[in-house]
């Protein structure tokens, strides 16, 4: 059973996006991000669908900060421990994305292209 809610916030990209194609030509991209907090770090999984999935891979890299809007859900995730307990995984299906703070290397390349 999933519980969904709307969420928006700034996150930091932790890993390279992973893409896969499901059904017939539906592109899905997913990767892990972190909310920028001082004391507790909260790592969540983002999922992008369709054209937005392709744009994310093209324009955003590791260590970029992005502003996202989407639906948050708690998914059951079985861990590989000896007692096989079920844990929860936070997953956000992103509907809109905006650049917030891009990494230094890409900013210089973009300026030199002008």
What are the roles of these predicted feature ranges?
Residues 1-114:
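Single-stranded nucleic acid-binding surfaces, predominantly the OB-fold ssDNA-binding core
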């Amino acid at each position: 059973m999933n519980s969904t809610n709307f969420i928006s916030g700034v996150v930091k990209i932790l890993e390279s996006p992973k893409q896969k194609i499901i059904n017939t030509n539906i592109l899905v991209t997913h990767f892990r991000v972190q909310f920028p907090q001082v004391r507790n770090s909260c790592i969540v999984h983002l999922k992008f669908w369709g054209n937005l999935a392709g744009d994310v891979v093209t324009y955003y890299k590791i260590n970029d900060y992005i502003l996202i809007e989407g639906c948050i859900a708690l998914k059951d995730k079985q861990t590989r421990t000896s007692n096989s307990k079920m844990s929860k995984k936070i997953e956000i299906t992103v509907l809109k994305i905006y650049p917030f703070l891009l990494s230094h290397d890409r900013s210089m390349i973009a300026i030199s292209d002008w």
